[in-house]
Swiss-Prot record:
Family membership: Belongs to the YciB family.
Superkingdom, natural source: Bacteria
Protein name, entry field: Inner membrane-spanning protein YciB
Record localization: Cell inner membrane
Matching InterPro entries: YciB
Keyword flag Membrane: yes
Keyword line: Cell inner membrane, Cell membrane, Membrane, Transmembrane, Transmembrane helix
Transmembrane segments: 4-24, 25-45, 52-72, 76-96, 118-138, 150-170
Pfam families (UniProt xref): IspA
Record's GO cellular component terms: plasma membrane
Membrane-topology annotation of the record: Multi-pass membrane protein
Amino acid sequence: MFKLLSEIGPVVAFFAGFFYGGGIQSATLYMLITSVICITLCYIIDKKVSRLSIISTAVLLVSGIITLISGDSMYIKIKPTILYVIFGIIFLTSGIKKNPFIKYALESIIRLKEESWITLSYRTATFFFFMAIVNEIVWRNFPDETWVKFKVFGVVPITFVFILLQLPLLLKNKLPDSKI
Protein backbone atom coordinates (compact mmCIF):
# COMPACT_ATOMS: atom_id res chain seq x y z
CA MET A 1 0.00 0.00 0.00
CA PHE A 2 2.81 2.40 0.85
CA LYS A 3 4.45 1.76 -2.54
CA LEU A 4 1.25 2.87 -4.27
CA LEU A 5 1.06 5.98 -2.10
CA SER A 6 4.69 6.79 -2.82
CA GLU A 7 3.94 6.63 -6.55
CA ILE A 8 0.81 8.78 -6.53
CA GLY A 9 1.80 11.13 -3.69
CA PRO A 10 4.12 13.29 -5.82
CA VAL A 11 1.50 13.51 -8.60
CA VAL A 12 -1.16 14.61 -6.10
CA ALA A 13 1.29 17.14 -4.65
CA PHE A 14 2.01 18.45 -8.15
CA PHE A 15 -1.69 18.81 -8.94
CA ALA A 16 -2.42 20.52 -5.61
CA GLY A 17 0.60 22.78 -5.99
CA PHE A 18 -0.51 23.86 -9.45
CA PHE A 19 -4.15 24.57 -8.69
CA TYR A 20 -3.91 25.69 -5.06
CA GLY A 21 -0.32 26.82 -4.65
CA GLY A 22 0.15 29.26 -7.47
CA GLY A 23 1.15 27.49 -10.66
CA ILE A 24 3.87 25.37 -12.16
CA GLN A 25 6.70 26.62 -9.92
CA SER A 26 4.81 25.74 -6.74
CA ALA A 27 3.70 22.44 -8.25
CA THR A 28 7.28 21.57 -9.13
CA LEU A 29 8.52 22.42 -5.64
CA TYR A 30 5.76 20.37 -3.97
CA MET A 31 6.48 17.42 -6.25
CA LEU A 32 10.22 17.56 -5.56
CA ILE A 33 9.74 17.62 -1.81
CA THR A 34 7.12 14.86 -1.86
CA SER A 35 9.24 12.66 -4.15
CA VAL A 36 12.31 12.94 -1.94
CA ILE A 37 10.23 12.16 1.16
CA CYS A 38 8.57 9.17 -0.54
CA ILE A 39 11.76 7.62 -1.90
CA THR A 40 13.45 8.11 1.49
CA LEU A 41 10.54 6.45 3.30
CA CYS A 42 10.53 3.58 0.77
CA TYR A 43 14.18 2.98 1.53
CA ILE A 44 13.64 3.18 5.30
CA ILE A 45 10.60 0.86 5.24
CA ASP A 46 11.61 -1.64 2.53
CA LYS A 47 15.40 -1.30 2.76
CA LYS A 48 15.43 -1.00 -1.04
CA VAL A 49 14.27 1.24 -3.86
CA SER A 50 13.58 0.01 -7.40
CA ARG A 51 15.85 1.09 -10.23
CA LEU A 52 12.92 2.65 -12.05
CA SER A 53 12.08 4.73 -8.97
CA ILE A 54 15.69 5.88 -8.70
CA ILE A 55 15.80 6.84 -12.40
CA SER A 56 12.44 8.60 -12.15
CA THR A 57 13.44 10.56 -9.04
CA ALA A 58 16.82 11.51 -10.51
CA VAL A 59 15.24 12.86 -13.71
CA LEU A 60 12.64 14.69 -11.62
CA LEU A 61 15.30 16.28 -9.42
CA VAL A 62 17.31 17.50 -12.40
CA SER A 63 14.34 18.80 -14.40
CA GLY A 64 12.61 20.17 -11.31
CA ILE A 65 15.62 22.05 -10.01
CA ILE A 66 16.32 23.51 -13.46
CA THR A 67 12.65 24.56 -13.67
CA LEU A 68 12.82 26.27 -10.28
CA ILE A 69 16.13 28.03 -11.00
CA SER A 70 15.33 29.12 -14.56
CA GLY A 71 11.62 29.79 -14.10
CA ASP A 72 11.05 27.91 -17.38
CA SER A 73 8.36 25.23 -17.10
CA MET A 74 9.63 23.46 -20.23
CA TYR A 75 12.05 21.42 -18.13
CA ILE A 76 9.41 19.90 -15.87
CA LYS A 77 7.16 19.31 -18.88
CA ILE A 78 9.81 17.32 -20.76
CA LYS A 79 10.52 15.15 -17.70
CA PRO A 80 7.78 12.63 -18.60
CA THR A 81 9.05 12.49 -22.18
CA ILE A 82 12.59 11.79 -20.99
CA LEU A 83 11.38 9.09 -18.60
CA TYR A 84 9.11 7.48 -21.17
CA VAL A 85 11.95 7.34 -23.70
CA ILE A 86 14.38 5.91 -21.10
CA PHE A 87 11.84 3.28 -20.04
CA GLY A 88 10.98 2.53 -23.67
CA ILE A 89 14.65 1.95 -24.45
CA ILE A 90 15.07 -0.26 -21.37
CA PHE A 91 12.10 -2.45 -22.29
CA LEU A 92 12.99 -2.55 -25.99
CA THR A 93 16.65 -3.46 -25.53
CA SER A 94 15.87 -6.01 -22.84
CA GLY A 95 13.39 -7.63 -25.23
CA ILE A 96 15.90 -7.63 -28.07
CA LYS A 97 18.50 -9.21 -25.79
CA LYS A 98 15.92 -11.86 -24.77
CA ASN A 99 16.36 -10.82 -21.14
CA PRO A 100 13.12 -8.88 -20.57
CA PHE A 101 13.33 -6.38 -17.73
CA ILE A 102 9.57 -6.57 -17.25
CA LYS A 103 9.96 -10.20 -16.19
CA TYR A 104 12.02 -9.14 -13.17
CA ALA A 105 9.51 -6.42 -12.33
CA LEU A 106 6.43 -8.67 -12.48
CA GLU A 107 7.59 -12.25 -11.97
CA SER A 108 6.62 -12.22 -8.30
CA ILE A 109 3.04 -11.50 -9.38
CA ILE A 110 2.67 -13.59 -12.52
CA ARG A 111 4.74 -16.27 -14.23
CA LEU A 112 4.64 -16.45 -18.02
CA LYS A 113 6.17 -18.41 -20.85
CA GLU A 114 9.49 -16.82 -21.83
CA GLU A 115 8.31 -15.67 -25.28
CA SER A 116 5.34 -13.93 -23.62
CA TRP A 117 7.70 -11.87 -21.45
CA ILE A 118 9.48 -10.76 -24.60
CA THR A 119 6.19 -9.86 -26.31
CA LEU A 120 5.09 -7.96 -23.21
CA SER A 121 8.44 -6.17 -23.15
CA TYR A 122 8.00 -4.98 -26.76
CA ARG A 123 4.44 -3.89 -26.08
CA THR A 124 5.52 -1.98 -22.99
CA ALA A 125 8.32 -0.29 -24.93
CA THR A 126 5.82 0.73 -27.61
CA PHE A 127 3.49 2.08 -24.93
CA PHE A 128 6.24 4.22 -23.40
CA PHE A 129 7.32 5.60 -26.79
CA PHE A 130 3.66 6.39 -27.53
CA MET A 131 3.31 8.18 -24.19
CA ALA A 132 6.46 10.22 -24.93
CA ILE A 133 4.91 11.40 -28.20
CA VAL A 134 1.58 12.21 -26.53
CA ASN A 135 3.32 14.17 -23.75
CA GLU A 136 5.23 16.20 -26.35
CA ILE A 137 2.03 16.96 -28.27
CA VAL A 138 0.14 18.04 -25.15
CA TRP A 139 2.78 20.25 -23.52
CA ARG A 140 3.81 21.93 -26.78
CA ASN A 141 0.28 22.68 -28.03
CA PHE A 142 -1.82 23.39 -24.94
CA PRO A 143 -1.69 25.69 -21.91
CA ASP A 144 -0.08 24.59 -18.63
CA GLU A 145 -3.45 23.86 -17.04
CA THR A 146 -4.35 21.39 -19.80
CA TRP A 147 -0.97 19.67 -19.52
CA VAL A 148 -1.33 19.33 -15.73
CA LYS A 149 -4.85 17.92 -16.07
CA PHE A 150 -3.63 15.50 -18.74
CA LYS A 151 -0.74 14.43 -16.51
CA VAL A 152 -3.13 13.68 -13.64
CA PHE A 153 -6.36 12.61 -15.36
CA GLY A 154 -5.14 11.40 -18.75
CA VAL A 155 -2.03 9.35 -18.08
CA VAL A 156 -3.62 7.10 -15.45
CA PRO A 157 -6.63 6.05 -17.60
CA ILE A 158 -4.41 5.54 -20.66
CA THR A 159 -2.07 3.36 -18.59
CA PHE A 160 -5.03 1.43 -17.17
CA VAL A 161 -6.36 0.76 -20.69
CA PHE A 162 -2.91 -0.42 -21.78
CA ILE A 163 -2.78 -2.84 -18.83
CA LEU A 164 -6.28 -4.14 -19.61
CA LEU A 165 -5.26 -4.72 -23.22
CA GLN A 166 -2.41 -6.94 -21.97
CA LEU A 167 -4.73 -9.23 -19.98
CA PRO A 168 -5.47 -11.61 -22.89
CA LEU A 169 -1.73 -12.18 -23.41
CA LEU A 170 -1.14 -12.64 -19.69
CA LEU A 171 -4.08 -14.99 -19.10
CA LYS A 172 -3.40 -17.08 -22.22
CA ASN A 173 0.31 -17.53 -21.47
CA LYS A 174 0.53 -17.72 -17.70
CA LEU A 175 2.20 -20.77 -16.23
CA PRO A 176 0.21 -23.16 -13.99
CA ASP A 177 2.08 -22.10 -10.84
CA SER A 178 1.32 -18.40 -11.41
CA LYS A 179 -0.30 -16.51 -8.53
CA ILE A 180 -2.77 -14.81 -10.86
